[in-house]
């Protein structure tokens, strides 16, 4: 027993030593990158695995991939050569040794940005990975032209890879931006940029941020630059977090600062399907992204004052939509206190509202959903699987910014008079001939009642 106690004391001492090192003057890590849990990954593991390039310690060494196009060691070495050539144009004495030493100083900060400790990776392996992966990302996203860092011509994904085709460019963007595990801290990219040009740190931040905004606009996910919501950091933790920063609703239904106990204790449980809401008289309307100041991204769902129309920004679904949404959810699952749960709340909403083929068909007709899949059933299945395995409390206003909207819609659905009127409108009044017939029958009934009343009155007067 004494041996056991001694062993536990040693481990506690080691643990306390590790905690002390985190706060010994090194920068705190704002965004933690963790391994996707099996419960979530098992729904569709391909949505979390890289197809073109493996980045970061979770994918080191090169993972076993079904894709034959995964970037090899020589591809990343070629990127290092391009970055070094650009650096020597500004600083002729620049060497690889300088990069290695500078990144070695960031090793502890970088390791603190991951949920795993990676004790099996030596310092040399870890720094080597950071340097090669960082150079690969910068050379692809920023671009290297004529042996200098061309940060003034970021452009589109197609233009950022001068020697490859559009498909390769899109594959790079997908892997380095969209995947939760496939990340290295943003400050590593800034450090490499700082060593490469005189003002490289600021320029890397500015131009990669512009690149991300252009990407979100072209995919129709967001239209405006990020709006900072405390306590979220101003500087992105990694590239996926940079995309996440663009997805903030303009106005929250309930302020996150409001204690749960002060909110109306009505449980929302879950959203009803689009067809159920439609049966209760709720209309769905596509909300235009052109409403400047009123809508910033696809999360800006709005219920009109009367509660009869739910305005939802159009979700343009392509082959990468599910991958991006799933990985954004994973980012929030790991960093809820820092980044919130807005994307998760939106995904829970849209996945429950559009969970059947008829729901997708209805929302497609209203312009809320646009997709290029083979059929609506396939899209409905993807929506139904979107939030499997996640942890989310719909009754917590700090998690669910759409809680008040859900409550109002539920009250409308539970109102029998509204449902009867809605049923009458949908069953009869949408067909003009049926409406005319119903009106004529109603007029005839009223006239018959009037005639009966007059007949009774005349009888008593006699």
Protein language model features and the residues they cover:
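C-terminal helix/juxtamembrane-tail motif
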Residues: 427-428, 442, 446-462
């Amino acid at each position: 027993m004494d041996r056991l106690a001694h062993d536990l004391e040693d481990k506690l001492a080691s643990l306390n030593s590790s905690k002390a090192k985190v706060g010994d003057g090194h920068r705190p890590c704002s965004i933690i990158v963790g391994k996707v849990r099996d419960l979530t990954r098992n729904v569709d593991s391909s949505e979390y695995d890289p197809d073109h390039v493996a980045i970061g310690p979770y994918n080191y060494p090169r993972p076993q991939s079904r894709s034959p196009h995964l970037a090899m060691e020589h591809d990343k070495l070629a990127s290092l050569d391009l970055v070094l050539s650009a650096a020597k144009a500004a600083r002729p004495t620049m060497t690889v040794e300088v990069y290695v030493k500078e990144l070695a100083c960031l090793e502890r900060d970088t390791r603190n940005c991951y949920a795993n400790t990676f004790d099996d990776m030596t310092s040399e392996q870890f720094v080597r990975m950071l340097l090669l992966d960082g150079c690969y990302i910068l050379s692809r996203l920023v671009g290297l032209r004529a042996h200098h860092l061309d940060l003034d011509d970021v452009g589109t994904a197609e233009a950022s890879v001068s020697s490859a085709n559009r498909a390769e460019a899109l594959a790079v963007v997908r892997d380095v931006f969209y995947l939760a595990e496939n990340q290295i801290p943003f400050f590593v990219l800034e450090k490499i940029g700082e060593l490469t040009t005189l003002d490289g740190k600021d320029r890397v931040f500015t131009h990669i941020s512009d690149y991300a905004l252009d990407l979100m606009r072209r995919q129709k996910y967001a239209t405006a630059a990020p709006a900072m919501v405390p306590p979220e950091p101003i500087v992105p933790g990694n590239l996926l977090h940079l995309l996440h920063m663009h997805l903030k609703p303009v106005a929250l239904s309930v302020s996150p600062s409001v204690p749960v106990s002060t909110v109306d204790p009505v449980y929302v449980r879950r959203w009803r399907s689009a067809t159920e809401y439609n049966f209760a008289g709720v209309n769905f309307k596509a909300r235009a992204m052109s409403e400047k100041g009123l809508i910033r991204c696809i999360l800006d769902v709005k219920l009109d004052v009367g509660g009869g129309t739910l305005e939802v920004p159009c979700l343009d679904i392509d082959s990468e939509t599910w991958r991006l949404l799933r990985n954004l959810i994973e980012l929030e699952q790991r960093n809820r206190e820092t980044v919130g749960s807005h994307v998760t709340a939106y995904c829970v909403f849209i996945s429950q509202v559009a969970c059947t083929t008829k729901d997708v068909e209805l929302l497609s007709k209203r312009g809320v959903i646009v997709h290029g899949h083979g059929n609506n059933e396939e899209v409905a299945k993807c929506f139904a699987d979107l939030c499997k395995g996640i942890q989310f409390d719909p009754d917590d206003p700090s998690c669910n910014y759409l809680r008040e909207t859900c409550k109002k819609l539920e009250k409308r659905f539970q109102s029998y008079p509204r449902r009867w009127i809605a049923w009458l409108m949908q069953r009869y009044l949408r067909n003009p001939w049926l409406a005319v017939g119903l009106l004529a029958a109603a007029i005839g009934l009223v006239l018959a009642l009037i005639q009966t009343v007059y007949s009774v009155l005349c009888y008593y007067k006699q």
